[in-house]
Amino acid sequence: MTPRHLLAAGDLSRDDAIAILDDADRFAQALVGREVKKLPTLRGRTVVTMFYENSTRTRVSFEVAGKWMSADVINVSASGSSVSKGESLRDTALTLRAAGADALIIRHPASGAARLLADWTAGQSDGGPSVINAGDGTHEHPTQALLDALTIRQRLGGIEGRRVVIVGDILHSRVARSNVMLLHTLGAEVVLVAPPTLLPVGVADWPVTVSHDLDAELPAADAVLMLRVQAERMNGGFFPSVREYSTLYGLSDRRQAMLGGHAVVLHPGPMLRGMEIASSVADSSQSAVLQQVSNGVHIRMAVLFHVLVGLESAGEEGAA
């Protein structure tokens, strides 16, 4: 059996992406009213999370998703594993495969780590474990893009034809890359707004419009996705000061007033309140930040189902 993976948002067809969004809604409905939030969908499956970067939302939501589906979830961190003794990622992956893991969920600072993991653990008669990319360097974060798309669909009633403005540190953002690819697949119009220094080389080849003027883009926006400036990936010199960046690219009360009443504000977290987004905006009725977190659990349930069981019987399994 060839294992199913989720390594990049661009690997998803339109039909697969929509099926995952639909399955996420089904799993959410299947849990409504249950005193014990448990579905038998993945009983007997072992899911291992491998987080080599700090995380709250993604790590916790994957763990909750697995447990709500009755999987056995094992957490592996760099500090608590043989990696701290010098073991390579490849040897760790092969060890987990030999131990019987059905799925490996990886977050790693190196771009391409998830695809390497899938290659390293493949090639045996059983096909190896499924690999899910929970964020690799500045490359991709496909489950974040899926939960963002689900949130937009829930708030706006659909994605196709919607104008989504992504603002901030595009250069270092795996969230931006995955959202661009997935939203394009689902028929949205994507606009990137950032200073020239925070745009990647080759962005002209992406299926997007690029702007440096946030005020000009907000009135026509259906959704605005604000990104954190990733100072941990910078050596300085990308913009003059935090104050100037916030003045030019922060979503303030004044800028929120430029949005249509239907528009939704998103942020993948963690938020730098007062820098890229004002606290009053983050806590407003137009903000879907907490809805994104809730959707993250349901999307990751759907993704685990997709890679471990398959899409064809999601409705039957989800309702079990």
Curated annotation (Swiss-Prot):
Self-association state and partner proteins as the record states: Heterododecamer (2C3:3R2) of six catalytic PyrB chains organized as two trimers (C3), and six regulatory PyrI chains organized as three dimers (R2).
Keyword Lipid metabolism in record: no
Organism (species): Mycobacterium marinum (strain ATCC BAA-535 / M)
One GO MF term: amino acid binding
GO BP, sorted A to Z: 'de novo' pyrimidine nucleobase biosynthetic process; 'de novo' UMP biosynthetic process; amino acid metabolic process
UniProt KW Transferase keyword: yes
Family: Belongs to the aspartate/ornithine carbamoyltransferase superfamily. ATCase family.
EC number(s) given by UniProt: 2.1.3.2
HAMAP family: Asp_carb_tr
Entry-linked SUPFAM superfamilies: Aspartate/ornithine carbamoyltransferase
Keywords (A to Z) from UniProt: Pyrimidine biosynthesis, Transferase
One family name in Pfam for this protein: OTCace
Residues annotated as binding L-aspartate: 85, 174, 228
Task performed by this protein: Catalyzes the condensation of carbamoyl phosphate and aspartate to form carbamoyl aspartate and inorganic phosphate, the committed step in the de novo pyrimidine nucleotide biosynthesis pathway.
Binding, carbamoyl phosphate: 57-58, 107, 141, 144, 269-270
Protein name, UniProt field: Aspartate carbamoyltransferase catalytic subunit
One annotated Gene Ontology cellular component of this protein: cytosol
Metabolic or biological pathway, per its Swiss-Prot or TrEMBL entry: Pyrimidine metabolism; UMP biosynthesis via de novo pathway; (S)-dihydroorotate from bicarbonate: step 2/3
Catalytic activity: carbamoyl phosphate + L-aspartate = N-carbamoyl-L-aspartate + phosphate + H(+)
